[in-house]
């Protein structure tokens, strides 16, 4: 019974610490939120660990610490004890927010999602198109758009986005 009380108290403290970090994020106190999330993420047994690493990554992004942000996301996607969905989400966020890495590095982070039956595969494929455009690989972007538009499993919203991108870049190519 003493262990259960101690364990419940520990969980309450962890949740309060995590939500305090979220509050600091909301108030744009990114240095303080990073400090809180770092402390939360170091507790390996805590249920808030993964969420705290995501919070730390976002705090580092807001502080302009892109290398640290990438490292935080890498901690998530390389940890085999963390679920695939969260690993894939960390990969996608690291690519979306990273304005320093080169094309090969960014595409390398997306490859595991693109080559697996992930729930986030279509989103990663769209993000790859954005990378092609960002790095001026417009032929690859147009080809990827064609391939994605031919898939039966894309949503109407995705079709609309891809069609719009295709129209914009095809009109500039003429």
Task: Place the predicted regions along the sequence by residue.
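Single-pass alpha-helical transmembrane signal-anchor segments
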Residues: 1-6
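Charge-dense, low-complexity intrinsically disordered segments
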Residues: 8, 27, 156
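Short extracytoplasmic/periplasmic juxtamembrane "stem" segments immediately C-terminal to an N-terminal membrane anchor
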Residues: 11-32
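Short helix-capping and inter-helix turn/linker motifs at the boundaries of alpha-helical repeat units
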Residues: 11-12, 47, 119
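N-proximal accessory regions
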Residues: 16-19, 41, 121
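Non-membrane alpha-helical segments in proteins
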Residues: 18-22, 51-62, 89-94
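Extracytoplasmic/periplasmic/luminal assembly and interaction segments
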Residues: 28-81
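Soluble extracytoplasmic domains of inner/organellar membrane proteins
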Residues: 60-63, 70-72, 76-174
